Amino acid sequence: MIAHFAREGYVTLPDFLPPAELPGLQRLCEAILVERVESAQAAGGFGWDGTTTLWVRLRREEELILEALPLGPRLRHTAAALLGAAPADLRIGGRIFYKAPRVGRALPFHQDEAHRDPAFVHNSLNAFLALDPATPCSGGLRYLPGSHTQGIRTHVAIGGMHEAVGIPDVDPAGVVTPSLQPGAAAFHHCRLVHASGDNTADHPRRAFVFVCEAPPQRLATPLPRPWLASSLSTAELQY
């Protein structure tokens, strides 16, 4: 596991979540999604109808619920082993990614570290915990193996969309798209070039995604990342 992650920049664990734990996490995911949408609508926010992609940052109290489950220490120790860090040193933040059936949109190739504070070298990974089948048809993750060893690539606006900042020139020949069944997990390094496809399946693609961060290393001079000004607010740079 550790050797594969170091070489390829990602690793998939098909049996990461025992079957008995899956229904509870699926129910928790649905409850959070419903609460967020209802709260936003009540406040006069967006009118989400369930037919688009939805990204939700978990509140601290929701993260604490997950940390108290058997999933919590399992996630922390697995991520720490892959990053070569002490489990207690990790900061872990949670999100929910929801891609609606047949209409959930693709995300362009990018590197997570390219969207983080350029004053640091980051040592982190994303853990994608599938709650539905995540396959090439349902918008599964697409990885460029080994690309995490090649530095940060230039990111540009894709298709003129403000929120879609990515890498335009990735050769698809080397890309892999692992298929994950519910309960499987995929871990990828913050410098790995990756994307996700459209959801053309008849089912949603729900996932908990956990950003697991070991302490970053401060640089004497911040790295140039001009795309940050157009793709992120400074509030997103929480380091």
Summary of predicted features, one role per range:
Residues 117-136, 179, 211-215:
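Short, conserved beta-strand element in jelly-roll/cupin
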